[in-house]
Every structure is written in C-alpha cells, then in structure tokens.
C-alpha cells in the first residue's frame, strides 16, 4: 500500500513538472510543436539506450503482427495526446492545465463501453466529485487570470488529449496482451509514434526554425 502511494506521489510530481516545463518553454518563446516532438524523440533515444537487444527484438516481432494497429494507436495514445496537451500550454497557465488534466480520469471511465464493459458508476461519481473539488479550488484563480476564450480552447485541447491517451493506450494493451512487458510496450509505442513526431518536427522547422538550446534542455528534462 505504501509503495503504491509513493509511486503515485512520484508520478504526480513528474507529471506536474511536465506542465510547468511546457509553460516555461512557451513563455520563453519556444514552440509547442518542438516541445511535443522533442519530448518523444528524446524519449525514444533514452529507451533505445536502456532497452536490451532481446527486448527490442521481441518488440519488433510483436509489432510485425499488427503494424497498422500499432501505428494507429501509438499515434493516438502518444501523438495526439501529447500534441494537444502541449498546445494547451499556449492558452493557459500550468496550474490551469494541470487542473484540467484531471478530466482524463472521467474520459477514461466513459470510454469503458468501447472495451466491452459497463461504465463503473462508483469510480465515475468519485472522479466527478474530485473534479468538482478541483474546480472550486481553482475558480477564483480562473476569475483573476481573466483568460476568457483561451480557457475554453485549453479545455477543448485537454479533452482531446484526455480522450486520446486512455483510448490509445488501452487499445494497445488489449492488442498486446501479455506478449510484452510494460517497458517493452512503452518502447514500441514510442517507436511507432515517431513518424507523427518527425512530421511535427518538420512543420516546426518550417514555421519557427530550429529549437533553442534552452528548449532542447527543457524537452530533455521532460523526456526523463
């Protein structure tokens, strides 16, 4: 129990750091196109460095069975998810995006029928109750910040990200089953989302030029 709580706290810390670093890159003139694509490019290189040869071979064999599904759901679960989450940082403060991200729990529960199960009402009500609490805590900050239409755009982007993330990941888990470990599945999805990220990186180069040293460093920290 203590181990689970500790893992949850550490995970929450690193995810919160992601929102802060994304906002920091935005405020210093960095493009969200680079913020999103660099995170997964660096992440792939890090995983490539630490994955054993046998594990990489196993992943490639599993991918070869259903390459189209891997490409689709990896792009959805990693690509669309992080693209829109990074884009949201252009329209709201890190605390606001972090608060909105709690919506992903509700989105994940509402997607349950797509996997042949009924919506679990108790977890749904608990998640909604938590969301109400988060909203009440941040309501005054929202009024003071005077974000206006930007808050609505950020909400839409986070909803897209919050839907793509659980849908893509759970679909991949259903396809893979027990044939891969969690780390191998992470490596495989990162690998198969690379075509999407390379396209985003090419668009970023065309629109804003190459990323700054500061953005490269911060993106590397997010990837870690």
Q: What is each residue range found by the language model?
A:
Residues 28-80, 107-111, 129, 163-168, ...:
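Transmembrane alpha-helices of multi-pass small-molecule transport proteins
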């Amino acid at each position: 129990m203590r181990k689970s709580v500790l893992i949850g706290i550490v995970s929450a810390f690193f995810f919160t750091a992601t929102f802060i670093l994304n906002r920091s890159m935005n405020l210093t003139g960095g493009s969200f196109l680079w913020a999103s694509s660099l995170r997964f490019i660096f992440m792939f290189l890090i995983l490539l460095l630490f994955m054993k040869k046998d594990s990489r071979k196993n992943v490639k064999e599993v991918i070869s069975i259903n390459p189209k599904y891997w490409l689709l759901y990896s792009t959805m679960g990693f690509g669309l998810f992080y693209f829109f989450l990074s884009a949201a940082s252009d329209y709201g403060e890190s605390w606001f995006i972090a608060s909105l991200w709690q919506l992903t729990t509700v989105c994940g529960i509402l997607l349950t029928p797509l996997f042949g199960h009924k919506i679990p009402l108790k977890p749904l009500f608990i998640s909604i109750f938590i969301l109400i609490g988060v909203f009440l805590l941040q309501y005054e900050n929202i009024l003071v910040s005077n974000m206006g239409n930007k808050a609505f755009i950020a909400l839409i982007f986070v909803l897209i990200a919050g839907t793509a993330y659980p849908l893509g990941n759970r679909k991949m888990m259903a396809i893979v089953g027990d044939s891969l470990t969690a780390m191998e599945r992470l490596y495989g999805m990162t690998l198969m989302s690379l075509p999407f990220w390379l396209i985003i990186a090419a668009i970023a180069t065309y629109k804003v030029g190459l990323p700054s040293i500061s953005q490269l460093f911060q993106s590397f920290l997010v990837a870690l």
